[in-house]
Amino acid sequence: MTVGDWGQSLLYASKLGPKACSLVDLGHHLPNANIEQIVSLLLMEGKLGGFHFNDSKYGDDDLTVGSINPYQLFLIFNELIEGMDARKMNHANDLGWMIDASHNVKDPLEDLLQSVEAIKIAYAQALIVDAAALDEARQNNDVVQAQEILQNAYRTDVRPLLAEARMRAGAALDPVKVFRELNVRKELVKERGTKTVATGL
């Protein structure tokens, strides 16, 4: 049986009971779908189970996370933070976080590094949204001020902060650069060989 859209997924999950939830795959929505609203609704209903992070354009629904629409990714995280905090959910463990990408023209490990960075950027930007001011703007129906608050956070360059966090954790300041300098791909090929079998599973 095919699940046609998020509404059908929510219906099935509701019928199956409290342990059944919906998975939101960012690439599997109609063009211009309000995914952040879908996320908010599923959270309100207690039926959001997790994510497949990716991006989509034309017929490709498994592009690098944040490569096409990073603003929407930020808005999704804004809804997640607000909704999860209201329900006292643990950001790290209470939802399933997965990257679902198909690496046809990129090194898959480099693509994963870029995807993780995009997720961290959107999450950090959403964390610095002035939630109290945004709530006040909403209560006053002040759409202009709400937009200003969201876009001020979105336009804040949090990459130096993330680099500092990596450095303090003993990780690379520039993961892609270090990956290339250390010839990680070459070493993995040497270790695993060049003969691979793709099963499609």
Write out the residue ranges for each language-model feature.
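Histidine-acidic metal/acid-base catalytic patches
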Residues: M1-L201
